[in-house]
Every structure is written in C-alpha cells, then in structure tokens.
Amino acid sequence: MKANNTTTSALWLQITYITMEAAIGLCAVVGNMLVIWVVKLNRTLRTTTFYFIVSLALADIAVGVLVIPLAIAVSLEVQMHFYACLFMSCVLLVFTHASIMSLLAIAVDRYLRVKLTVRYRTVTTQRRIWLFLGLCWLVSFLVGLTPMFGWNRKVTLELSQNSSTLSCHFRSVVGLDYMVFFSFITWILIPLVVMCIIYLDIFYIIRNKLSQNLTGFRETRAFYGREFKTAKSLFLVLFLFALCWLPLSIINFVSYFNVKIPEIAMCLGILLSHANSMMNPIVYACKIKKFKETYFVILRACRLCQTSDSLDSNLEQTTE
C-alpha cells in the first residue's frame, strides 16, 4: 500500500512538473519574441544595450524551444545512448551560460556609457559590438559543451555497467565536480560578483555626477537621471537571474557532498531556473517606459488588426 502511494505521488509530481515546464516555456517564447519585436519596431531602442538585450532574449527563447523540452525528456529517464543523453544535457547548459554572458555584456556596456560619456560612441563601434556578442556565444558553447570533450561520467558508468545505453538523467552523465567548480563557481558565481561590483560602481559614478553643482547643465543631469533609471531596471534583471539560479546551484553544491536532496526540491529548483526566462519581458514592460509604450502599440495594433504602416505611424507618435 505504501509503495502504491509513493508511486502515485511520484507520478503526480512528474505530471505537475511537466505541466509547469510547458507553461513556462510558452510564456518565455511569447514574451521574448515580443521583446525582439519591440526592439525591431522602435528605432529609439536600437542602441548597444538593446542589442545585448536581444541576445539575452534569444537565449531565453532557446530555453523555451529547446531547453525545456529536453529537460522534460531527461526527467522521463528515457533509455538512450550515453552520448545522446550527454549532448541533451549539455544543450541545457549552453543557454544558461548564454544568459549570464549577455548579462555581463549589458553590465559592461552600461559602465562604459557612464564612465566614458564623451568617447562612448567611438569605443562601442558596430564591429566591436558584434565581436563581443560573438565572443559571448562562443564562450557559452565552449563552457556548456565541455562535458562532451571528456569531463563526464562515462568512465564511472562503464565501471558499474557494461551497456552503452542508460536511463537518461542529467546527473547520470554530467559530473557534479563539473557543475559545481567549473559551471557554477567559475562561470556563474564569479561573473555575478563581477557584475554586482560593476553596477555598484555605475551607481556611485551617477550619484557623484548628480550631486555635483550642474546648474545650467540640464541635459547632463537629465542624461545621468535616465542612466540611473536604466541601470536600476537592468540590475533588477540581474538580481532576478541570481534569485532564480542560485537555489539550483546551491542544491548541486550540497549534493556534491553526498547530501540527499528531496525530489520535489530538485524539481522546484529546475522550475525556478527556467522561470527566469519569462521574467525579463515583464521587467522591461514595468520599468522601461519606451518598452511599455511599444508593447501597448503592438497589442493595440494586434487587437485592431492594423497594417504595418499604421503600426509604424503609431510608433512614431510614441517616440516623439
């Protein structure tokens, strides 16, 4: 009887997990496609920072389209070849690191904007932006795919079983030493600390500029006022990323020391990490005025079935 109850509760946990993953994936895809559409339509948002925001949105769309379906497949523990399971698990990691690298790029860009106000446009050329974006994604793929090049559990599994197939589960193929020391500490925790320091310096610079006697320099005060609001909004995006990803990272860290973690805690940690991908569009809508205005224009246009010409004219009115 007790075994039946355990099986039933495990089944309900799996059904609930899959349902919530599907809902999160749908919201992440729709919300972040809307973010990209907003940047495409609103010319005033085509700045360096928003190129990096689009990069972050692409990573979040990939979470909805690729990561969540693969996470569901991995949770079902389907029987497959070791390297097929490992590749699926690595894909989950690639887009996590794409998000953190995009956030780092955004932080560096905002820092350059307030630190090198006059030289900013000459430093952040179009070519350098694309090079930096390419570097961010290259690092993400290299870090995420590292287990494919040998840092995995194949040798451990070969010692315990002769078959090359297994019930695919993330921890069956990816070692906790990689997850804790390389993926988390080196490529998530350290960048998070660096970004916090960058934002603290940004706020310090802006506060100093605003506290100076800038009588007669209204434009300068207005510039730093806008930068302060934007920095606060983007720091909130960073804070939410940390809030969503640290619980799962802490679970992995604790598990490394052979502490048994309840299955429900693991599921909640995974769901929270994936939920981060649907939060950013909401933050932009609430905190960035131009985003909010363009969202409303798009929603109004969709409701009234407007043509692209009328949509453009409405956008011109909002940007004036």
Swiss-Prot record:
GO CC terms, sorted: dendrite; neuromuscular junction; plasma membrane; presynaptic membrane; Schaffer collateral - CA1 synapse; synapse
Lineage top rank: taxon: Eukaryota
Location of the protein in the cell: Cell membrane
Free-text description of this protein's post-translational modifications in UniProt: Phosphorylation on Thr-318 and Thr-319 may be crucial for rapid desensitization. Phosphorylation on Thr-318 may be necessary for phosphorylation on Thr-319 to occur.
Membrane topology value: Multi-pass membrane protein
Extracellular side: 1-16, 75-86, 151-179, 258-263
Keywords attached to this entry: Cell membrane, Disulfide bond, G-protein coupled receptor, Glycoprotein, Lipoprotein, Membrane, Palmitate, Phosphoprotein, Receptor, Transducer, Transmembrane, Transmembrane helix
Disulfide bonds: C85-C168
Signal sequence residues: none
A biological process term (GO) from this entry: positive regulation of calcium-mediated signaling
GO molecular function: G protein-coupled adenosine receptor activity
Cytoplasmic compartment segments: 40-50, 109-128, 201-233, 287-320
Gene3D superfamilies linked to this entry: Rhodopsin 7-helix transmembrane proteins
Major localisation: membrane
Modified residues (Phosphothreonine): T307, T318, T319
Residues annotated as transmembrane: 17-39, 51-74, 87-108, 129-150, 180-200, 234-257, 264-286
Residues annotated as glycosylated: N4, N5
Role description: Receptor for adenosine. The activity of this receptor is mediated by G proteins which inhibits adenylyl cyclase. May play a role during reproduction.
Family, similarity comment: Belongs to the G-protein coupled receptor 1 family.
PANTHER family noted in UniProt: ADENOSINE RECEPTOR A3, OLFACTORY RECEPTOR AND ADENOSINE RECEPTOR
Protein name (record): Adenosine receptor A3
